[in-house]
């Protein structure tokens, strides 16, 4: 069960915030975010495939940060079950995104080949 005090949820919140901020200005970032950014080209190609009707530069920056984190966790890190990662991404979209963010994030992640 996710709670606001869950350390994994807190880590994901901080990472989404960091990934979001980096799109606007240079700033110090934590090691986990650096690792994700090293895979940014790979992750962004997966996003383009999963949501072909939206170009990367047109996707809401909060949604983009959430997708980057979730796709990294799904395809690179692989330490949590896909259902957990997708559920957590949808929760983050509810917290940080707009009204359509949860369904957009869920739909895009549903199109990712992670087996």
Positions of PLM-derived features:
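N-terminal interaction/assembly modules
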Residues: 1-102, 107-115
């Amino acid at each position: 069960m996710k709670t606001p005090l869950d350390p994994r949820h807190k880590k994901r919140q901080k990472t989404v915030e960091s990934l979001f901020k980096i799109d606007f200005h240079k700033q110090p970032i934590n090691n986990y975010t650096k690792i994700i950014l090293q895979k940014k080209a790979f992750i962004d190609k997966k996003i383009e495939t999963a949501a072909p009707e939206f170009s990367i530069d047109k996707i809401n920056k909060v949604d983009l940060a959430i997708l980057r984190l979730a796709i990294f966790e799904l395809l690179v890190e692989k330490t949590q079950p896909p259902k957990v990662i997708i559920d957590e991404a949808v929760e983050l979209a509810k917290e940080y995104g707009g009204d359509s963010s949860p369904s957009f994030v869920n739909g895009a992640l549903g199109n990712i080949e992670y087996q």
